[in-house]
């Protein structure tokens, strides 16, 4: 951890969460050994040793220039600390992409009219016992100090972090749940389904920002809560989010960048990519305007991570925030597709990435 940046190891984080079950994350999900590119471009580079696309004069924004300089610094430090691998596997991340396809090949029950009831289990539970007419409308909690297991009708196992609570359904259901249980959250992390012409998630939310405008975020927050929103690199989106925070009576305290890197420490995209794909995403952090709590957060922090090969998955942030002295007792993740310990997670696919297709037995233990 540097004052300007950090290098996260998401794989090790999940391994630590499920150590009690003798599980580890499937390492191939993180075998991002080369930059992201179409197979045709990769084959051309492999044959000729050069890219097959014509480069225009390099045009990068001030933001990209800063990130490019930071990427060099991160690679140098990571190499010196022997964090990064020296050799890459020349398969255009094929093994990792196949692992992602397998990881997503699971069935998540449909949501029905939301209930505020919490069903608790500890060691193991059958998915059928959590469902009604083939759908889930309750909130499910793994109440033990160790991870639990949910098994569906075909024998597929889902591994649930300790003291985590999840709900399959619309994120707006959290408002009714919050009122029913007199529960406010002191940390909210959200990864909304921002509209994209090139990528559309499996049927989940409307692919626009209307779902955000329907959320009444302030009513589920404690007075001194911190909120963290992932945003895309679409032009104007940061300004839109600032306006939305203002509507919620909140102000931005910092904007961080996630730099996505290969196992060798290189950015997964070129900074002058003609298709406007860049190797970083932004995380906006905000608090209530009338809160007197001071968050000692660097304004322009960068954290680098080898991404899981599942599209749009973001690294867990709890330990990173704790490093900066952020104390929280009731964290909430909106639009969740994976679960975290002692955290409420809400979305149409909250335990998508908890299946046995993501984890395997840790034979080293």
UniProtKB/Swiss-Prot annotation:
Molecular function GO labels: methyltransferase activity; nucleic acid binding; site-specific DNA-methyltransferase (adenine-specific) activity
Reactions catalysed according to its record: a 2'-deoxyadenosine in DNA + S-adenosyl-L-methionine = an N(6)-methyl-2'-deoxyadenosine in DNA + S-adenosyl-L-homocysteine + H(+)
Enzyme type, top EC level: transferase
EC number: 2.1.1.72
InterPro entries, sorted: DNA_methylase_N6_adenine_CS (IPR002052), MT-A70-like (IPR007757), SAM-dependent_MTases_sf (IPR029063)
GO biological process: epigenetic regulation of gene expression; methylation
Entry annotated with the keyword Lyase: no
Keywords from the named record: Methyltransferase, S-adenosyl-L-methionine, Transferase
Pfam families listed in its UniProt record: MT-A70
PROSITE patterns: MT_A70 (PS51143), N6_MTASE (PS00092)
UniProt keyword Transport present: no
Protein family per UniProt: Belongs to the MT-A70-like family.
Function: Methylates DNA on the 6th position of adenine (N(6)-methyladenosine). N(6)-methyladenosine (m6A) DNA is involved in epigenetic transgenerational inheritance.
Protein name, per record: DNA N6-methyl methyltransferase
Lineage of the species this protein comes from: Eukaryota, Metazoa, Ecdysozoa, Nematoda, Chromadorea
Name of the gene this protein is made from: damt-1
